[in-house]
């Protein structure tokens, strides 16, 4: 573990001023990492294990078990140093990820979630009481079935916890909660590459983010907020790790906005001519695609002018001499006919109601750079799209993993620094798993440390 601790962390911990440290730096780090490896839910239970296990104390480097306050103070006082440890591990694990699967390592996936704080508003009875009152009110007033008490409850609940205005209301996994919001960037292997904690410091460093008042739709609010956080989060990621240069972005429909496609796929958004080549983002159902000459389906594929339900066939991608990429689509009724006399094949359209006089049938050329939203460097609705987009779920599994298995959920505190440190420690634990799996050549366990230590 000494190899991953920056010298600045050591200098800060063993400062020349102040009292002499009774407990070594590596002992605190090992104890907190082991807590997450074995999914020990509370710091107090960790200290109990240390008190009754001499071998565990010796492994960590403790000669005496510290108080619970020492653990808390360590997290709060050395939060920035823990962030440095995490950032160092990201750089250490990048070559490992590239060696395992370079295609997936070149993917960037983003999602956001929240750490539920220990506040009154997170008691299930709090939301249930409001919903019950609204249902009774709707019944008394004779409202019809279009009235949604859950949306009404969302609108009537406060936007932040009374104990701390930084603990914001959020709608996660089908329930209302009050959380410290964070964002996670992973690669296609599901290995965490970046963590952003959306507190006052983050907002101050990105003044271009405008926080709007909440609407009546919790899902819509989360989508709008996530789309505003994406580019600032990725800019922070690439500025910390300039040698990491992924080419493919995967995200959900919350990021389906014309401006985001332009930022992701063109220009100097993340550095000098540094941007993604492809963006796998499904179209938002609320806003489709339009074209005057022919209809376009929900995947951005042109359809027959006479039959919108009949999509044209994708025939390939080509590059012009100018370097411009174009996609070619042909009539779905077209077939290749072999001529024995010339020993060549030619196209022939067998449509009963042709939309063109050409014997080959209608052909459509799409230039992606003219409409990045419709054609973000790839074609929706194809087998390749479906296979690639499935990978996006690794970020959701990662979030569930760090919450359930790496001791992020159920923390009985509302202190921002403590919960932020817990989040970073969860990321550190996962990256140490990658290093350990690589050392013993068991890459199948890069996201599962328990089988490695069993």
Regions found by a protein language model. Give the residues of each.
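Basic, short loop/linker segments at the boundary and entry of helix-turn-helix/winged-helix-like folds
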Residues: 1-34, 38
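Basic, amphipathic alpha-helical segments enriched in Lys/Arg and hydrophobic/aromatic residues
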Residues: 387-454
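Long, low-complexity, polar/charged, intrinsically disordered or flexibly structured peripheral segments
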Residues: 163, 327-381
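Short amphipathic alpha-helical "interface-anchor" segments enriched in bulky aromatics
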Residues: 50-51, 114, 293-330, 368-416
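Major-groove recognition helix of helix-turn-helix-like DNA-binding domains
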Residues: 60-79
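An internal, acidic/charged active-site-proximal segment
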Residues: 219-220, 226-339
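Polybasic low-complexity intrinsically disordered regions
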Residues: 73, 77-249, 253, 258-266, ...
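DNA-recognition alpha helix
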Residues: 43-60, 91-94
């Amino acid at each position: 573990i000494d190899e991953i601790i920056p010298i600045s962390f050591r200098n800060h911990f063993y400062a020349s001023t102040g009292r002499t440290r009774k407990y070594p730096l590596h002992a605190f780090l090992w104890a907190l990492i082991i807590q997450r490896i074995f999914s020990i839910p509370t710091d107090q239970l960790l200290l109990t294990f240390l008190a009754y296990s001499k071998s565990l104390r010796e492994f960590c480097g403790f000669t005496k078990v510290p108080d619970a306050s020492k653990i808390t103070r360590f997290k709060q006082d050395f939060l920035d140093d823990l962030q440095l440890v995490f950032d160092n591990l990201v750089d250490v694990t990048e070559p490992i990820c590239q060696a395992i699967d370079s295609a997936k390592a070149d993917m960037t996936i983003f999602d956001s979630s929240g750490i539920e704080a220990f506040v009154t508003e997170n008691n299930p009875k709090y939301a249930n009481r409001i919903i019950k009152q609204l249902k009774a009110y709707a019944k008394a007033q004779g409202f019809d079935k279009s009235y949604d008490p859950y949306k009404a409850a969302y609108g009537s609940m406060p936007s932040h916890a009374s104990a701390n205005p930084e603990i914001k209301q959020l709608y996660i996994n089908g329930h209302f909660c009050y959380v410290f919001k964070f964002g996670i960037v992973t690669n296609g292997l599901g290995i965490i590459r970046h963590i952003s904690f959306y507190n006052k410091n983050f907002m101050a460093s990105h003044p271009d983010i405008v926080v709007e008042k909440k609407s009546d739709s919790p899902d819509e609010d989360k989508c709008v907020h996530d789309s505003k956080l994406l580019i600032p989060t990725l800019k922070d990621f690439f500025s910390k790790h300039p040698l990491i240069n992924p080419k493919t972005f995967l995200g959900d429909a919350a990021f389906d906005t014309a401006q985001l496609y332009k930022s992701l796929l063109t220009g100097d958004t993340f550095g000098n001519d540094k941007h993604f080549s492809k963006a796998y983002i499904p179209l938002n159902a609320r806003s489709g695609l339009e074209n005057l000459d022919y209809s376009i389906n929900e995947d951005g594929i042109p359809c027959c002018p006479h039959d919108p339900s009949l999509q044209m066939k994708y025939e390939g991608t080509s590059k012009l001499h100018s370097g411009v990429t174009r996609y070619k689509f042909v009539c779905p009724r077209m077939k290749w006919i072999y001529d024995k006399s010339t020993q060549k094949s030619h196209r022939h359209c067998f449509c009963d109601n042709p939309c063109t006089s050409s014997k080959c049938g209608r052909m459509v050329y799409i230039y992606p750079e003219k409409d990045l939203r419709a054609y973000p460097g790839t074609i929706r609705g194809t087998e390749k799209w479906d296979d690639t987009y499935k990978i996006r779920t690794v970020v959701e599994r990662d979030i569930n993993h760090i919450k359930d298995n790496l001791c992020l959920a159920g923390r009985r505190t509302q202190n921002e620094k403590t919960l932020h440190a817990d989040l970073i420690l969860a990321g550190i634990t996962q990256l140490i798993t990658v290093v350990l799996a690589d050392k013993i050549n068991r890459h199948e366990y890069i996201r599962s440390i328990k089988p490695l230590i069993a």
